[in-house]
UniProtKB/Swiss-Prot annotation:
GO cellular component, one term: extracellular region
Entry's family note: Belongs to the neurotoxin 19 (CSTX) family. 04 (U1-Lctx) subfamily.
Residue numbers covered by the propeptide annotation in the UniProt entry: 21-41
Organism encoding this protein: Lycosa singoriensis (Wolf spider)
Keyword annotations: Disulfide bond, Knottin, Secreted, Signal, Toxin
Pfam hit, one: Toxin_35
Organ and tissue specificity: Expressed by the venom gland.
Record's keyword annotation contains Transit peptide: no
Protein name from the UniProt record: U1-lycotoxin-Ls1b
Cleavable signal peptide: 1-20
UniProt-annotated location(s): Secreted
Broad class of where this protein is predominantly found: secreted
Molecular function in Gene Ontology: toxin activity
S-S bonds: C44-C59, C51-C68, C58-C86, C70-C84
């Protein structure tokens, strides 16, 4: 009877130990994934920075990815060039305003 009690007592310990190794492996995979996401985040173009050469490389904002917005600039010499920057489109600003207002009301 004593041997059965010892085995029953050790069984949950062994199960928790084996599952914790699986969790450690999962955490290591998540850490590698987060490091890869951080690397991509460093490569993206921040808000208000020029994106003329890479129009799809803008970073993510709070809720939406910034969009590359372009304008035509006329220099003093009279030549036209296109200049682009990463920014938040007006409809995204409105959505962020509504969500922020909703968070203040509903907590």
């Amino acid at each position: 009877m004593m041997k059965v009690l010892v085995v029953v007592a050790l069984l949950p310990t062994l199960i928790s130990y084996s599952s914790s190794e699986g969790i450690d492996d999962l955490e290591a995979d998540e850490l590698l994934s987060l490091m890869a996401n951080e690397q991509t985040r460093k490569e993206c173009i921040p808000k208000h920075h020029e994106c003329t050469s890479n129009k799809h490389g803008c970073c993510r904002g709070n809720f939406f990815k910034y969009k590359c917005q372009c304008t035509t600039v006329v220099t003093q010499d009279g030549e036209q060039t296109e200049r682009c920057f990463c920014g938040t489109p007006p409809h995204h600003k409105a959505a962020e305003l509504v969500v922020g207002f909703g968070k203040k009301i509903f907590g």
